[in-house]
Amino acid sequence: MKITLLNKLINDQKKVDKKLYLSGPYWNYKNSKTIFQLRKKGLKNFRGLESGVGTSFADNLILDFRNELNFKGRIVSSFLNIPYINKIFSGQLAVTSSHIKNYLKNLSIVYKNNEKVKNLIKKYVFEKTTEFGCTNKFTLNNIDYSTHYINMAYRIDILSNTFNFKNIRSFFEIGGGFGSNIHFLLTNFQNIKKIIYLDTVPNIFVGTEYLRYFYGDSVKDYLNTNKTKKISFDDNDKLEIICIPPWQIENLDQIIDHFHNAASFVEM
C-alpha cells in the first residue's frame, strides 16, 4: 500500500476550495472513518467482514459496527472492552456472523440459479472478481463470481442497448467506487485504452491501488500528476489509467469519447 500517496492526497486536499472539492457531511464522516481504517488495517481484505475501509462504496458487509465509527464513537464504544460487557457483545457478533452466513448462502443460491445471471456469464468475461477478500460472491462451475460484478455487467448490458462500448477508445468515470467498473470494462472491451478516473479522497486512493493490482504501471496516480498543469493522455495505444482527486478536474486537457457516472451524482 502506497502510504505516501494516501498522505499526499490528504494533505493537498486541505489546500483546495472546500465548497467545491470536499465531500458533504455524510461522506465527510465516511471518509474520515475510511482513512482511519486504511491506516489501521490497510487494503488487505477490504471487501471482507473485518474491514471498515470500503463501507458505502465497496461491496463489503458490516459485521462489527465499531469499524464504522469515527474518533468520538470509538471513545464511547470503548466501554465494550469491559469484561462482562465484552462477553455479551462477543455473543452478539456471533449471532450477526451467523445471520450473515445465512444471507450469503441464500444470495449464492439465488444468483447461481438465475437465468439472467447465467446469460451474463456466457456473454461477458469475469476475471479475478473476488480479490481482496470479497464475501458477496457465489460459485458456479467451480469459478467464484462477485455479485457486485454481476450487477455491473447487468448495467453495462442494459446501456449497451443504446450505446456501443466497442466504439470508444477513451473513458472518463466520476465516482467509480473502488475501481471495479473500470476493471470489468477493460476486461471485456479491449478497444478501451485510455481512462480517467476521478473520485473523492480517500476513495480515489482505494480505487487507484485496486486498479494498480491488475494493471501495474499502466496506472498513473496523484504522485505522478500533482505538479502537472495540463493532464492528458500519452499519444499512443498503450493502456493508460489516470487516477485523480476532484480538484484536478481543472487540469484536464483531454477530449473523451465516453463519460460515465453510475450513482454518486444522485448523492450530491
Where would I find each of the regions flagged by the language model?
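Conserved SAM-binding loop of SAM-dependent methyltransferases across substrates and taxa
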Residues: F178-Q190
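Conserved acidic residues
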Residues: R169, I256-D257
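Membrane-proximal basic amphipathic "stem/tether" segments
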Residues: M1-S32, I75, L104
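Conserved Class I S-adenosyl-L-methionine-dependent methyltransferase catalytic core
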Residues: I35-K166
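S-adenosyl-L-methionine
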Residues: L211-L252
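Conserved SAM-binding motif I beta-strand of class I
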Residues: K194-T200
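A short SAM/SAH-binding and catalytic strip from SAM-dependent methyltransferases
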Residues: H258-M268
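Conserved class I S-adenosyl-L-methionine
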Residues: N167-G177
